[in-house]
């Protein structure tokens, strides 16, 4: 595939595809995670199975297993094998610390879960510093419905990650993506929402034609995306509670690549209503447009700097797709990518330090990371035909679409490149990922 063909896929999809939208409900199909590589330098941590007193009525979720999987996926921590745990304590006074020090782990998680009279669950957890022989975190949750047990496990994972790294965890967050399946020989597309680990997948719309470019609002309550339900590209705004859906851009020509401003007051768009494909900003309260770029080249895939003062976007104004930065106060436009003949799909880390992008090279199209402080540029992946990088809200991971064995899947790579994971569905292909914000 040539560089130009890769670049033109976006425009081609916008121009020629049609879209048919309908609500639907189907059995959920969670993403399956395969961890390709784990760091040998990961810190061991003991995650003790939570105490459960009734062997004949086990809770529907194994909290310790979920928490261990969360921390393992970070690449920073390695849960000790369950078979090697010297005991199953659930209280501080039950811990024989010499046994745990011999295990080589400095920290351990213990806890209990009980079913109450309402049929819900009471949970207690304690995070222990083994060397100091003291509890550093202790918390209880009461009357938790079964459907929220996984969420409690992710909250515990976030607490442990913050305690151990000083960085807020991002396990209790959501991701959006598009799944493509074959139904009666025809392609069917669905926009789905899932937990950050791919579980609890919920489709929010279904189409016989592609769905593109989902973008989360900063409060995590709405998605903007591109649809073709009326035979042309249109940008749709939809609330995740199902109460609101409306078309917000249906101009002549291309309507694509929506991206929310950090304060949620504006949406950056790619429009060709004035001839060429350029970047515009829509005021979400008034609907008024502000044109940011004026160039005959294709200008698209914009994303906001965290301070809201500039936009990063993809343009072939220099003959090949590269990443540029437009400063909204001065109008200055500056090229920022110089390594390689092809760079597209910019995504900015939450702290504004890094720009992830797709770099075209002899090995295909890979996720690359540009450090705006040092200008260090490095390839992050060894996969093929990567697309749509998206940072986790804590900036520690990058979610992206890739191709493996001829099938589109999602993958996650840690910012330090110590671990990668592949997320796939058994009955389809997954693409166009977008990592949502913190929910509280």
Where are the language model's segments positioned?
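Short beta-strand->alpha-helix linker/helix-N-cap micro-motif
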Residues: 32-98, 109, 113
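Residue-level detector of Asp-centered blade-edge/turn motifs that repeat once per structural unit
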Residues: 169-171, 218-219, 262-263, 306-307, ...
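Hydrophobic beta-strand positions that form the internal "hydrophobic ladder"
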Residues: 175, 223, 264-268, 308-312, ...
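Multi-bladed beta-propeller domains
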Residues: 195-210, 238-256, 282-300, 326-342, ...
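Amphipathic beta-strand/beta-sheet edge segments enriched in Tyr/Trp
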Residues: 31, 92-159
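Structural motif
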Residues: 119-122, 184-192, 232-236, 276-280, ...
């Amino acid at each position: 595939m040539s560089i130009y063909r890769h670049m033109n896929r976006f425009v081609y999809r916008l121009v020629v595809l049609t879209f048919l939208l309908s609500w639907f409900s189907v059995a959920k199909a969670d993403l399956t995670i395969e961890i390709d590589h784990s760091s040998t330098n990961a810190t061991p941590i003991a995650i003790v199975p939570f105490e459960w007193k009734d062997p004949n009525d086990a809770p529907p979720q194994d909290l310790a297993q979920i928490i261990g999987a969360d921390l393992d996926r970070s690449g920073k921590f390695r849960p000790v094998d369950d078979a090697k745990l010297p005991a199953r304590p659930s209280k501080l006074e039950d811990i024989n610390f010499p046994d745990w020090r011999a295990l080589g782990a400095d920290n351990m998680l213990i806890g209990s879960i009980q079913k109450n009279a309402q049929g819900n669950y009471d949970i207690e957890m304690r995070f222990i510093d083994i060397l100091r022989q003291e509890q550093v975190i202790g918390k209880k949750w009461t009357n938790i419905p079964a459907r929220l047990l996984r969420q409690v496990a992710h909250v515990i994972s976030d607490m442990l990650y913050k305690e151990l790294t000083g960085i807020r965890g991002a396990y209790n967050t959501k991701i959006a993506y598009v799944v493509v399946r074959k139904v009666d020989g025809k392609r069917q597309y669905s926009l789905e929402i899932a937990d950050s680990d791919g579980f609890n997948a919920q489709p929010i719309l279904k189409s016989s034609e592609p769905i593109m470019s989902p973008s989360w609002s900063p409060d995590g309550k709405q998605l903007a995306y591109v649809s073709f339900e009326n035979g042309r590209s249109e940008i749709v705004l939809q609330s995740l509670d199902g109460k609101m859906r409306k078309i917000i851009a249906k101009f002549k020509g291309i309507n694509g690549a929506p991206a929310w401003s950090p304060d949620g007051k504006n949406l950056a768009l790619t429009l060709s209503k004035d001839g060429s494909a350029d970047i515009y900003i829509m005021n979400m309260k008034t609907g008024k447009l502000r044109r940011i770029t004026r160039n005959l080249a294709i200008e698209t895939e914009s994303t906001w700097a965290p301070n809201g003062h500039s936009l990063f976007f993809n343009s072939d104004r220099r003959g090949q797709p590269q990443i540029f930065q437009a400063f909204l106060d001065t109008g200055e436009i500056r090229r920022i990518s110089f390594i390689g003949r092809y760079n597209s799909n910019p995504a900015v880390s939450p702290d504004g330090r890094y720009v992830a992008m797709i770099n075209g090279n002899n090995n295909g199209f890979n996720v690359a990371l540009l450090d705006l402080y040092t200008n260090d540029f490095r390839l992050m992946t060894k996969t093929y035909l990567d697309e749509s990088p998206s940072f986790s809200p804590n900036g520690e991971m990058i979610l992206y679409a890739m191709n493996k064995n001829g099938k589109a899947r999602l993958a996650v790579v840690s910012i330090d490149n110590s671990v990668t994971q592949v997320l796939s569905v058994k009955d389809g292909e997954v693409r166009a990922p977008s990592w949502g914000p913190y929910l509280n």
